[in-house]
Amino acid sequence: MFVRKPATERPRLPSVGRLGLFDPHAPAHLDQLGWNTDDHVELLWSLSRAPDADAALLAMVRLADELKDDWDELNRLLLTDRPLRGRLFAVLGSSLALGDHLVAHPQSWRLLHGDVRLPSARELRETFDDAARSVDIERGASAAIPPLRDLYRDRLLVLAALDVASTVENEPVLPFVTVSAHLSDLADAALSAALIVATRTVCGDLDPRLAVIAMGKCGARELNYVSDVDVIFVGEDIEKDGRSDNLATATRVAGEMMRFAGDAFFEVDAALRPEGKRGQLVRTLDSHVAYYRRWAKTWEFQALLKARPAAGDPELGQAYIDALMPMVWTACEREDFVPEVQAMRRRVEELVPADVRSREIKLGTGGLRDVEFAVQLLQLVHGRTDESLHVASTVDALAALGEGGYVGRDDAANMTASYEFLRLLEHRLQLQRLKRTHMLPDDNDDEAYRWLARAAHIRPDGTHDAQGVLREELKRQSLRVSRLHAKLFYQPLLESVGHTALGIGEGMSAEAAERQLAALGYERPQSALAHLAALTGATGRKGRIQQILLPTLLDWLSDTPDPDAGLLAYRRLSDEHSDLRWFLGTLRDEGAVAKRLMRVLGTSAYIPELLMRAPEVIQMYADGPSGPKLLEDDRESRARALVASASRYADPVRAIAAARTLRRRELARIASADVLGMLDVIDVCKSLTAVWVAVLQAALDVVIRANTPDSGVPARIAVIGMGRLGGGELGYGSDADVMFVCEPNSGVEESVAVRWSVGVAEQVRALLGTPSADPPLEVDTGLRPEGRSGPLVRTLASYDAYYSQWAQPWEIQALLRAHRVAGDLELGERFLLMADKIRYPEGGVSASAVQEIRRIKARVDAERLPRGADPNTHTKLGRGGLADIEWTVQLLQLRYAHKVPALHNTSTLEALNAIGAAELVAEGDVELLREAWLTATRARNALVLVRGKPTDQLPGPGRQLNAVALAAGWGSDDGGEFLDNYLRVTRRAKAVVRKIFGG
């Protein structure tokens, strides 16, 4: 039998949960509005689509309370009028600030009803001007603030409602350029109204000739919802009745205008004027022209790209544009154009704290400033010869660059899309509270991301909810901007050298390519183009990978002190090693490796030569599980590996060749880690010392093995390190100062043992000193007793006898840094015990010896500095340089080591620590000496890294000094700042040196 089941019908009225209403008061709010019947289902679903439905509902409750009897009219319209519903719910769910405005001015909802359109620029200006003129100025300028502020907020309300309506209902989407242009028109109207009020306040009926030039985003007609409006004022100095006071009056008007606009509309910023905030607020046109011709910096011409008359005297405003814009298009010819552009880019990057960089839409990596900077630079470079680039807005400029072949059309379109997406998010973030911000929500704030996604009309995609889609899109867009940022500059350059497989169109001319490379920091653009042609001209896989790699590599190179040298080095490496299958693949697949390699190549002449013969070190530029691979393994294990590699060969020449191979690799590793900021200077010096010690040990072992007679080894030999080798503080350009000590084995005559040991020592020196393509391995024995005229090798007893009877003060001083480094350890240890009696005698060295040391130091200061050297910047022998610090420390050791055992130390830095701990010198003075030693050592090492050969003299201002600054770990390649710091530090240290040596 068929039984009919009772009908079950799901209620049509959605629950608050299904509507996305989370406020516990939401049910009561709906009841209060009467939105709780089946007639309201469609309205409720519209409400649910608001970016923040709870905020929209609460604002509606407050609005209903304020409307009182007029609420019924709005309530009735909301049931049937979809456009009104979309505009109202969307704007209330997007902007708490505009919700407050609407509640305070409840009748303003009518602005959103009916056929709503955006007024033209002329209509806006007429409306605002009329409002400004209708104010009773006798009551003071403040009387004009409320009506004009309300008018401005009403116009913002209408624009915002139209802008976000499509998030709620099927309303037309306002293009970003339309929104930004209207905001700029609104700002122009507000500036005009503020100028009228200010003029009436200051001058009454008189009208001083004053033009307001919009700059920045307002000037480009791409303004944000909330932004300072950048302006420049131009006045005219008119003589009247023998007096010239128009400019003073105009200045008072300009100041009053800025104050009034700040109270009624937005902050007006005139800091882009000549001389910035220190300059005159209002200048004549002639004064502006004179300033820009003589004093203006590159960034000031870049700012003029956006200049546009916005308010005030239109003829004067246009005259300003006509006079100054031609200068903009010749700015790239200025001598300091490239360094100033690079400095601007660095400043922008430094503005953003590292902990919020990933949240910064504007200034973060892959953000809006990256796009704007790239576009403006390309305009400055090519606008001199192409008037189609004389446009102000970023979007228009991108289109013009694409049309002109300076940027690939697809790249221009993609960059525009990314730019507009990021600007849309910026607009939504500002709209919420009408506050100036460019900061994305905190990563953990899911609710804020959910709101932002809905306000930006981002919907779930089946895999992610709306906020998940937004997060993924942000990553994608940021990566795309970073990638396109490089392509904008360099991809068309590659096509200009004849490779059209990139699908960019016809590309730019060779002349345009040279201009662009010059603007990006290449001093030899023709050579750079030749390198690009060679790199991309390779056939098959190599050429294709180079075409993919080069835009990004060139972008990274442009941030280095010497991109020309870097590109040449990269070409040489590619020519030599591109047949290694891993070489190009690693650069393509591991961005960290490629970026680090470009920094190294564009900074150092020393490292590329090593990489040519040790390319495997490039693979160490990658990151391993525990950090950079360049830092994997310790010094001791690497030293053991070097000695072991040499020990595999009986032939000394082949053994030394094996040792050189590992030394080359190790030098490339240390130097790379140094330039990349992974090692501090103390670690660098210790690592370089460990390499030298291992080479000496390997050479000594193999030579002894090759020269051992059938009767056995005639003598034990130890190598004593002197100078910086003994102190464990070698630099890249340091020789190895050593002494050889021997002791006959049992049954061997001393003369035979010494003769054999001399042969070993001479062969070690000869093998290591053989010329090669690697950095030299000079073994210097000049610090032995009697200097170069003394025996090359002595027995321990001979050393003891000589030092006890004949040692000169300088020889005692030299022993302060003696340390066993290779050979027989027990013999080396006994040598040091013997040396201790000489260098740390009971009661200290004699007063006459101290006096002799002081005399020698004075002679060194006067005579040893090379001819033509600058004593202020010679890192070794100059004022407050290494010699000054080391001699000072050694003098204190000679005087006090018998009292302070901690001074029995061959390291300058460790001895300085002991001097401070023993309070032999004031701690402040010790710190000055320590800082000077570290500064000079960094500089001296950096000189070798940059120039590729040992040198002690800092260069003058220019590329090389900038590179030295970067290689020395200064933090930027600002050579001027680095040099100022060097001079300051060494000057202070020299004062301490004089105090100690004089006392």
Curated annotation (Swiss-Prot):
Region annotated Adenylyl transferase, chain positions: 498-999
EC number(s) recorded for this UniProt protein: 2.7.7.89, 2.7.7.42
The organism of origin for this protein: Mycolicibacterium smegmatis (strain ATCC 700084 / mc(2)155) (Mycobacterium smegmatis)
Keyword field: ATP-binding, Magnesium, Multifunctional enzyme, Nucleotide-binding, Nucleotidyltransferase, Transferase
Gene3D superfamilies to which the protein is assigned, alphabetical: Beta Polymerase, domain 2 (3.30.460.10), Nucleotidyltransferases domain 2 (1.20.120.330)
HAMAP family, per database record: GlnE
GO molecular function, one term: ATP binding
Matches recorded under Pfam families: GlnD_UR_UTase (PF08335), GlnE (PF03710)
InterPro entries assigned to the protein according to its UniProt record, in alphabetical order: GlnE, GlnE_rpt_dom, NT_sf, PII_UdlTrfase/GS_AdlTrfase
Gene name per UniProt: glnE
GO biological process: regulation of glutamine family amino acid metabolic process
Coiled-coil residues: none
Role: Involved in the regulation of glutamine synthetase GlnA, a key enzyme in the process to assimilate ammonia. When cellular nitrogen levels are high, the C-terminal adenylyl transferase (AT) inactivates GlnA by covalent transfer of an adenylyl group from ATP to specific tyrosine residue of GlnA, thus reducing its activity. Conversely, when nitrogen levels are low, the N-terminal adenylyl removase (AR) activates GlnA by removing the adenylyl group by phosphorolysis, increasing its activity.
Family under the similarity heading: Belongs to the GlnE family.
GO terms for cellular component: cytosol
Keyword Aminoacyl-tRNA synthetase: no
Cofactor(s), by name: Mg(2+)
Reactions it catalyzes: [glutamine synthetase]-O(4)-(5'-adenylyl)-L-tyrosine + phosphate = [glutamine synthetase]-L-tyrosine + ADP; [glutamine synthetase]-L-tyrosine + ATP = [glutamine synthetase]-O(4)-(5'-adenylyl)-L-tyrosine + diphosphate
Region (Adenylyl removase): 1-493
Taxon lineage: Bacteria, Bacillati, Actinomycetota, Actinomycetes, Mycobacteriales
NCBIfam families assigned: PRK14109.1
Name the UniProt record assigns to this protein: Bifunctional glutamine synthetase adenylyltransferase/adenylyl-removing enzyme
